Amino acid sequence: MSDTEQPQAAEGTELVPTSNGPVVPEGQKKVKKIIRVKKKRPARPQIDPALVKSEPPPQTGTTFNIWYNKWSGGDREDKYTSQTAAKGRCNVAKDSGYTKADQTTGSYFCLFFARGVCPKGQDCEYLHRLPTLHDLYSPNVDCFGRDRFSDYRDDMGGVGSFMRQNRTVYVGRIHVTDDIEEVVARHFAEWGQVERIRVLNQRGVAFITYTNEANAQFAKEAMAHQSLDHNEILNVRWATADPNPMAQAREARRVEEQAAEAVRRALPAEFVAEIEGRDPEARKRRKMESSYGLDGYEAPDEVHFARGAQAVNPVGRRGFEDQLMLEGGGEEVSAREALFGAEGSGSGDGDAGGIFSSSTLAALNSAQVKVSAQPKQAAATGPLVAYGSDSEDD
């Protein structure tokens, strides 16, 4: 007995390693997966703060206007030939990063960052990145927080108007080359997703349409007084409304798609699937409910959604309760028979499929209606009956 109990005691007191993790079989190498979270980098200053100086404009007139920061009363100059090139240009790949504005919801974008001359870097109180579809602002202001006006300027420059959603930028004074379309697409695709580009090769003019209006506002400020592949100075303005009927139809269709998307987000997913016909069970249920007891009949959408169990208005749901009781007959009938006037029950004439029920016909038959003709009233006689204005005797 002692010889057999000793091995069992040894097995019971044997040390067993404990581990909470998965057991790795022998001969296999345990791989440890390390997830590295890429941190956002801070925005860098685009220019040296020591170089920022507020110099007055050169004197070109006799009177200096402190409100417009311009001289007046001098010789008239060509506003296109007298333009100077921009002092800097934004490089999104290197200059973008987080700032103090990232901690505040609803912050605007930095105008000087778009122009490439912001000296603050990560200490800036505005955003240093490109606008996205999730950056939504009031129509009265642009993405930089500047107030917009009810109408455009005469030269289509400035902030723009809040009366129309303008996503198209006009670019003039482009150096004409054979690859002008490729050059324009390469430089302006940096500021956001481009929907359409139209280039007039012989005139050096281009129209760039962005998918987001905020990107168009950013591109207008970023490319003002810039140059492409040559030393030209671009003239960037807002584009006027396109008179092309196809463009107007395309814009109207885009507005309808935006409205449909907004309605789609506001409604429940199952309701949207039923309306769009993507739910097979909903299609079968719709076909049965909209037949109204008639084989092969399916009511149109306006009839189905106006009258039925799922009608929006309470009047349309009236009559589709589970059971109704007729006041005169005293027997239960289905809701659809009570609503559409099916065959009458009880002692009737036996007419089926009529417009009126048997109880209504019985009430009309029992009613006694007497029609009496009213006597014609005689014409009133008075002192002016025989009076004639043309008579000489009166």
Swiss-Prot record:
Basic residues: bias regions: 30-43
Pfam families linked: RRM_1 (PF00076), Torus (PF16131)
GO molecular function (one): zinc ion binding
Domain RRM: residue ranges: 167-241
InterPro entries assigned to the protein according to its UniProt record, in alphabetical order: Cwc2/Slt11 (IPR039171), Cwc2_RRM (IPR034181), Nucleotide-bd_a/b_plait_sf (IPR012677), RBD_domain_sf (IPR035979), RRM_dom (IPR000504), Torus (IPR032297), Znf_CCCH (IPR000571), Znf_CCCH_sf (IPR036855)
Coiled coil: none
Gene Ontology CC terms: post-mRNA release spliceosomal complex; Prp19 complex; U2-type catalytic step 1 spliceosome; U2-type catalytic step 2 spliceosome
Zn finger residue spans: C3H1-type: 104-131
Protein family per UniProt: Belongs to the RRM CWC2 family.
Domain comment quoted from the record: The C-terminal RRM domain and the zinc finger motif are necessary for RNA-binding.
Assembly information from the UniProt record: Associated with the spliceosome.
Function (record text): Involved in the first step of pre-mRNA splicing. Required for cell growth and cell cycle control. Plays a role in the levels of the U1, U4, U5 and U6 snRNAs and the maintenance of the U4/U6 snRNA complex. May provide the link between the 'nineteen complex' NTC spliceosome protein complex and the spliceosome through the U6 snRNA. Associates predominantly with U6 snRNAs in assembled active spliceosomes. Binds directly to the internal stem-loop (ISL) domain of the U6 snRNA and to the pre-mRNA intron near the 5' splice site during the activation and catalytic phases of the spliceosome cycle.
Name of the protein in question: Pre-mRNA-splicing factor CWC2
Organism: Pyricularia oryzae (strain 70-15 / ATCC MYA-4617 / FGSC 8958)
